[in-house]
Every structure is written in structure tokens, then in C-alpha cells.
């Protein structure tokens, strides 16, 4: 199978090359995004692999089909950039079913810690041999109240991480999960606290 890989980033190649080693899959990497102006690059390929900023609208779908492409593989969970109705009966569309909810929740906590402890500023200062603490002190998260809006997989994992920091967790969801062991409140109350 020959695959045209669009919107390629430097971090894409090593992982994909390793994954296809020993298979009959051949990838040609393009840094350009797939769209109406670049669809001809897919000529001679069985499939295209696209990312969030590629455009797979009806015109692109029809041209891909005319070029002999039969597969659109997305490197993301979202598929709002793909006209799935236009693909029906022509192209098979595959996407990432979900991201790791742990990775997303942990990243959210990393951002919270960065904002609170100013680690981004501290990094820049120490790199420049400035070890002043002025403007870098944050506050203890322990004992603070955090509000979690949305208690799906990611929200529940984030709440668990916050509890591990000793934080009080309030939650809001249109459809509260009774098994989550979270303290649900209405959104205005969550925002107030």
C-alpha cells in the first residue's frame, strides 16, 4: 500500500517509519497540507494520511477518488475537517478513536502548576543565570478548591489528580455520574467557589 502523508512534522517520521518496518506499506511524506491546491500530490497513492489542518472537503474527496485513492487515515480524533458525507461510498475514513485521558488530564495539571508556580518564567531566568525568586512564588494547591466542568473520563481523572494534591474538588456536569464519588454542584455555585 502506498500512502501520501500530508502536513508532516519532524516528529511524525521516526514513529511511522518504525511502525511500518517489515510491512508492504510505503509512505511518502509531504510537509504541505492536503487541500484543493495540493490534492494532485496524491496521484498514484492508495491512501492519504492527514492531520487537523488538512482539508478533505467534497471537492478534495472527489479528486482523491478520481486519482484512485480509497483510504483517508486521520492522525487525530476529530474529523471536522473531513466531509464524511462526500466520502460515503468512495473513501474509507479512519481516525484515532481517542487520546489517552490520562495524558490530557496530566497535561491540564501541568498547565495549572506552570501558571501557579511560574515555572516557565523560572526556566528562562535560570537559563540566564538569574536566580531571583521575585515574582515566582505561587501558592499551595493543597487545601484549595478546584472546579471541574465536565466529568467524563478526562474530568474524572483530573479530579483524582487534584485530590492527590489534597485539593477540594467540586464538579459540574449536565449528567452527573453517581459512581464518580465527586461533589456535584450547579455551575454558578462552582464558579462562585
Predicted regions and their residues:
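N-terminal glycine-/charge-rich "phosphate-binding" loop or analogous flexible N-terminal tail
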Residues: 1-45
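Short beta->alpha connector loops
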Residues: 8-11, 31-35, 52-56, 75-79, ...
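Rossmann-fold NAD(P)-dependent oxidoreductase module
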Residues: 19, 107, 111, 157, ...
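Short gly/ser/thr-rich secondary-structure transition/capping motifs
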Residues: 28-33, 52, 125-134, 178-184
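Short amphipathic alpha-helix with an adjacent loop that forms part of the alpha/beta core around
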Residues: 36-44, 62, 186-192
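Phosphate/diphosphate ligand-binding glycine-rich loop within oxidoreductases
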Residues: 45-123
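Rossmann-like dinucleotide/phosphate-binding beta-alpha-beta segment
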Residues: 134-193
Amino acid at each position: 500500500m502506498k500512502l501520501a502523508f500530508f502536513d508532516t512534522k519532524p516528529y511524525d517520521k521516526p514513529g511511522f517509519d518504525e511502525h511500518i518496518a517489515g510491512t508492504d506499506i510505503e509512505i511518502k511524506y509531504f510537509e504541505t497540507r492536503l487541500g484543493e491546491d495540493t490534492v494532485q500530490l496524491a496521484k498514484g497513492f492508495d491512501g492519504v494520511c492527514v492531520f487537523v489542518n488538512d482539508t478533505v472537503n467534497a471537492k478534495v474527496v472527489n479528486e482523491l477518488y478520481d486519482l484512485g485513492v480509497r483510504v483517508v487515515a486521520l492522525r487525530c480524533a476529530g474529523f471536522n475537517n473531513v466531509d464524511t458525507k462526500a466520502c460515503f461510498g468512495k473513501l474509507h475514513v479512519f481516525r484515532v478513536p481517542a487520546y489517552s485521558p490520562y495524558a490530557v488530564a496530566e497535561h491540564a495539571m501541568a498547565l495549572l502548576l506552570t501558571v501557579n508556580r511560574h515555572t516557565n518564567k523560572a526556566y528562562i531566568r535560570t537559563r540566564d543565570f538569574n536566580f531571583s525568586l521575585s515574582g515566582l512564588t505561587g501558592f499551595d494547591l493543597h487545601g484549595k478548591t478546584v472546579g471541574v466542568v465536565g466529568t467524563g473520563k478526562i474530568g474524572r481523572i483530573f479530579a483524582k489528580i487534584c485530590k492527590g494534591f489534597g485539593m477540594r474538588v467540586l464538579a459540574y456536569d449536565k449528567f452527573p455520574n453517581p459512581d464518580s464519588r465527586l461533589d456535584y454542584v450547579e455551575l454558578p455555585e462552582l464558579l462562585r467557589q
